[in-house]
Structure formats: structure tokens, C-alpha cells
Curated annotation (Swiss-Prot):
GO cellular component: cytoplasm
Start-end of Low complexity biased regions: 200-223, 388-404, 635-647, 668-677, 691-704, 751-767
Role according to the record: May negatively regulate the snf1 kinase.
PANTHER family (alphabetical): PROTEIN SIP5
Composition skew (Basic and acidic residues), residue ranges: 34-44, 61-82, 172-188, 317-326, 556-585, 736-750
UniProt keywords, alphabetically: Cytoplasm
Main subcellular location: cytoplasm
Name this polypeptide is given: Protein sip5
UniProt keyword annotation of Phosphoprotein present: no
InterPro entries (alphabetical): Sip5/DA2
Subcellular compartments: Cytoplasm
Chain's gene name: sip5
Amino acid sequence: MGNSQTKESRPSLSSSNRRGHQWGSSSSHGRSPYGDRHHAEGSRSRGSRPDLSMFGIGGSSDRDVATLEHRRETKQEREARRLEKERVARLKERERSMREEHVDGGYLVTQGVYVGTEDFNKAVTRQLMIERRLAPFWRGLNDFSDSWTEHQLMAAARGLPIPPPDEIPPELEYKNPPRSTEEAKESTIQHLMVPITSRSQSYGSEASQSSTPTHSLPSPTSPFASGTSSSPLFRTRAKTLASLTSSRHGSQVDAGPKEIQLPKDPFVNGQPIEAYLYKDATECPICFLYYPPYLNRTRCCDQPICSECFVQIKRPDPHPPEHGETDSNAANSTSDRDRQESQDGQLVSGPAACPFCVQPEFGVTYAPPPFRRGLVYATDSSLRPTFASPVSSSSSLSSANPPAITGRRRATSLSANDPTVITTDRIRPDWAQKLANARAHAARRSAAATALHTAAYLMNTNSSGNESRNFSLGRRGVMRRTGTSENQSVSNRSGSPALQALAFLTDRRAVGPETDFAEEGGGNMAPPRNSSRRNRIDDLEEMMMMEAIRLSLASEEERRRKEEKEAKKEAKRREKESKKAEKAARKLGVYSNNASSSALDVLSDPRHGKGSSSSSSMTGEDTACGKGKEVERMPPSTTNATASPSSLEIPSDAANSSPVAHVIEPGSSAQAATTQSLARELPKPSHLRHVSSASSSFSSLVDSTPDDPTGAYDGSATATEPMFNFRSLAAVIGDEDKGVESTEHVEDTSSRATVASSASGVAPSATETSGAPATGVEPVSVETITENGDCLMPKELETRSVEITHTAPNTEATS
């Protein structure tokens, strides 16, 4: 095959040579007639140099790659061609076997129920089927009915369409078998030979060979009948010895049993063999096809199983032991030590289990039908009477063989070592070899890995030992010159790790001068034997050191990058939280603005005067100090005049304890007017926010003008920014409203409100004044509310004269 491949590849190489150098050869054709030859020889020599071809420098490297690809494709094509040829041959053999061979109406080849690879031993399976120890491959029926007639059963068994019950197709018509005559019986008896059990196997093989139907059977006129010396039974000793030593191939053929094809008889007890077999069909519980009742039976639970399903069951592939799994063949070891050695780190392949009861060592038994058809072995003495008629054969077999199948199941299970049991290992005898090959392969891989680890360990050990020796006594030549023993070198080799590391660094830094000193001082000594190995180890260590430094730098860079990323994430998170807080503050500002309009409704509706007064006074007594702020109505000039350069900024604890408040810009008088107009136009009942104000937090910050910066609040300084609490509006008509006066006048009570605020801890409220009604607006000076306890919120009270008349239908408020 190699020569043919070389011959096939030569034309392509020469043609590519000509194509590749056509321009050069044509250009130099007129110069020298030998130019082409020298050029071809030079290219051939360059391409054939092994030192250049390994680097891919040769001129024919491209051609070599193309040749390898072509060769690889040819190998694949040859493999595909071989597989296709085997498949075609297998199909032909299957068709021939189904056409010419059968065993009691069954076949010796599979019927295509499973399309996977057939990895069972076909020769062993064939032998077991011919010996009637394993059921043949019956043809399975997809459907079956007990009411089918004989020709319907025949059509189903032959794979033909099932005809109607009252119609018999021409191909299914048959005639009853003719009765056997006396002449036929006499001729049959002449072909039979009574088996003699006292003969040896060699004589039995000769007798079986003479009775094989493939050879000419002896006739009454044959030499065997006449008894002459030319008969095979009367040949000389020389002929016998010559026949024994003549052919090795012939001896191998004679060693096996001979198959005999019984006379073709398509009837059993007057019925067609298909009708006799399939009239009591049984379903296989695995493939769900209907077969004759003569199926295999499991040895453990006596369940039926067809042969096609049986040959698919096998041992698992070799694998490491799992969950205490033991090796089955280890039980046959001679001693416990051998069994333990076989279990240590070895692959196992447990026996196949029964698909029904999951008992290991799966095996089947088979009870053949009470007749014989097809192939038999000539050496089987019990099959000699089968040459007779079907009726006589069935009667004789009933006495020679076990009784036929009965409806009663077997009561006990059979052992896996029973002679009648066929296990899955029997039809796959190479399972032990496969397991041994897998174990050897695993052992080779383990040995290779162990060798690699050992080599690496020895290299590291030798390198450390060399470094320690270099640190203590210098080079190996110096050690030999000074007469240092091997024991001392071994003791130096096994130093402490710190000493070895120091020796390693010292030797790396002073390797040049030390080498020069050793060469100068020991010029008459032999060169060190492991210098090249030491250099390789040094190079390897340098590479490892550089790799370690690179990995360290990379890890540091990665850590720094992660820290930067975390810092960016934290900054984004804080920015997002600040935006959320600002947004929430704006929402609370709008909410408190609505609350101010609802609180001002109290003054515009006289019907809610007393009730609001009483409820607000009661609420004001229970609340903490500093929660009430009145609406700012001071002119912008006054506010700006009293404001200090550092405006008020409310601390966080004060913001958490302060009620809902709203701060209006000092210069926005239009906004205050709008708020008052809304309070007059919407006379709705107000809830005074005595509940919601206690649960709400700081309302909103001041939308201050650019010239009013915010600053930290100083407790000792006077308040400069007006703060408002709309609960104090309800306190305008406070507890003093319970009197009998018809008209109350509130004005100029800043000092009293200051005293009340500091004493009771509630918001400053306006007290009642003497009876004269207010005629105008009298602004009062701004007073700072003194803090009481933990009330840090500064408050300003600007009182306005408010006249409330019970008798008047409307409340008159002068602003």
C-alpha cells in the first residue's frame, strides 16, 4: 500500500515542481541546458535536509503539507470504503442466512429490532442457538390476535400483509404432507448410525465427518459398505499420521463441531411450522413484540425475554469503583492479599443485572420446542433420531429432552453457574480482556503522570542540593578536589529552607566569578558533568521568577483597578442618595405649602372657631416645645434688616424633631399675598395637621435668594430667618377663648408668648388682650424664643391684631 501511495503522489510532485519553476526554467533555458537539472537537484537537496525541514525552511514544505493532506484523505476514504464493504457483506450474509439457515423456525441473525452496534460474539451466539441452549432470533410481530387463522399466522410470520380470514392468497396455499412410506423409512434408517459412547473424540469426529450432509453419504455400493481396505476406517497407520500432520488449517477446521442441515420439512404435526409456532404467541416485556412461546427465561425471576433484547444487555464499561463497588473477578483471587491488591486503584466492570429484579449475574435458560428443524450439530447424540418424520421426532424427543413448557412458573431461581444458564458474559467472552486493556491503559497513564511528577521533584531537589553545595563548598570539582565525601554532600543538601534560599540567591549573583575561579584554580580537573543541566535549571528558575513577578504585578494592578471601580461606585451611590434626599425635600415642601393653606382656613370660617381653638390648645399642651411658628407677614425691608450675614441652617436632630414647616423667601411679598387670597377663597374645614405634623419630618428648605447664604445655627445668637408653624394660628384663639367675651383682641404679646414658650415647652401662642377692637396693623419687634431643653429650633413671633367676633357672621381679619 505504501508503494502505491508513493506512486500516486509522484506525478503530483513532479507536476507541481514543473508549475512552480516554469518561469525560472524558461528564462534560463537559453543559457545552459543543465540549468533545470541543477535547479531541481538543489531544490530536492534543500527539501530533503532534515535540519531545515523541521523548521519549515525547505523548498518543498508546501508540497509536503499537500501530500500529507492527500494521504490523510486517502486513509479516511479507505476506512469508509472498508466499513461500507463490511456492511454490504453483512447484509448479504444476513439475507443468505435468513434464506438458507434456520433453527426450529427461528433465525441465527438479528431481525433489526435494535439498530446499534452488535458487539456480542456472533460465533458463540450461533453455537448456543444451534445447541438449543439459547432461543433463536424469532421474527417479532407488531400485532397478534388469538382469532387468526393458519394462513393469517403464516402471513404475519413471513412479513406479508395479513389477508382476510376467508381468503387464502396463492403464495400461502399448501398441501398436507404425504404419509411416509416404508421405502422412505428404510432409506432413512440406512443413513443413521447408532452412537457409540465408548469411542474416543477422534473417532467420533471422523464418524461425524462421514455423516455430514455436505459430503457424499455412503451408499450400499460404497467402499464403506463393501469393507475393503480403501475405506477410511481401514486405512493404514502411515496414512493416518500423514493426515494428522498434513495441514494445520484442516486440523483447526476438524476441531469444531460440524453443523448438519436436517431434511427440510415445513410441517409440524400436519400444520405449517409458522402456524404451529405463532398460534400461542407471547409478548416480550422489553421490546413489546410478539414471539413464539419458546423464549428465554431469566434465571432469577423466570421472566420471558427475547434473544435480541438479551444480547443487548452487557457489563458496564470499565470505570473506577463507586459507592463501595467491588470487582467481580476479584472474588476468585487466591488470597485476600491478591484481592486487596486488585482492588487498589483498579478499574472495575460489574456484572450485568437483571432488567426485572436487578439481581446481578444476569442469565437466561431456554426450553426448545418439541421438534427439530434446520441446523443441528452432528456430535449431539440426542439429535440422532431427528431424521425421522415430525411425528416420530416429537415422540422420541419427548423422552430424550426435558418436558415441554408448561404454564407453571419455576419456583426457585437458578445459580449463575448452572449448566443450563447462559449469562451475558458467555456471549461476550472478551469482557475480561477489555477490562485488562483498560486497566493497563490507566496504569500507563498513571505511570506517565507519576514519572512526570518524580522528574519535577528530582529536578527541584537536585537544584536545591546543588545550590546548597555551591554555597558551602563551591562547584562539584572543588568538592572532589578537597576530598569531600558523598555523605557530607548529602548532609549539605538537606539544609534548612532559609539556608537553601540564601544559597540560591548567593549562587545566582556570584555565578560568574565563581565559575572563573573554578576554571582558573582547577584547570587540570575534568569539567563538571551536570553543567548543562544546571544551566537549564537556572534558566527555568529565572523564567519561574519572572513569571512570579509578572503575576504579582498583574494581581496588584487588578486590585488597584478594583479599588478604583469600588470608589466610583461609592461616589455614584452617594450622589444618587443626595439627589433622592433633595427630591424628597422638595416634595415635603409642596406638602407643607398645602398644609399652610389648610391651616389658614381656620381664620376665614367662624363656624370652626371654638372647636379648633379647643382642639389646638389641647394639642399644643401635649406637644414638645418649639413646634409652633406663625405665618411670616413682615415686610421685606424689616426681614432683610434683621437678617444676619449667616443664615439659619437647621441641624439634623432638630429637623427630626421639628414639625412640618414652610419657609418663604423674605422678599416674596406677592407669594404671601397669594397665600392669603387662597386662604380666603377656599373656606374648607381644616384638620389643623395636629396628627400629621407630629409624624412628619422637616418640610423643606428655603428657596433663598443668592444674596442670602445659609450657615450653621448658633444657639446664642438671635434668630435672623423667619420660621413658621401653622399650629400657632390655631393657638391665636387659644384656651382663653373659653371666656364670655364676645370679641377678643390679640396684639403685642410677644413678651408673654416668650414666657409661655419657655415655661410650657409648647409653641408660642398669642394671648388675649384688653377689650378694644383693633383698628389697624401694629407691627411688633421680633423676639427670639429661648430654647428649652432639647428644643433647638429658633422661633420668631410676629403678632398681628386679629379680631374675632362671635356675633358677626364673618371673621374680620386685618392684615
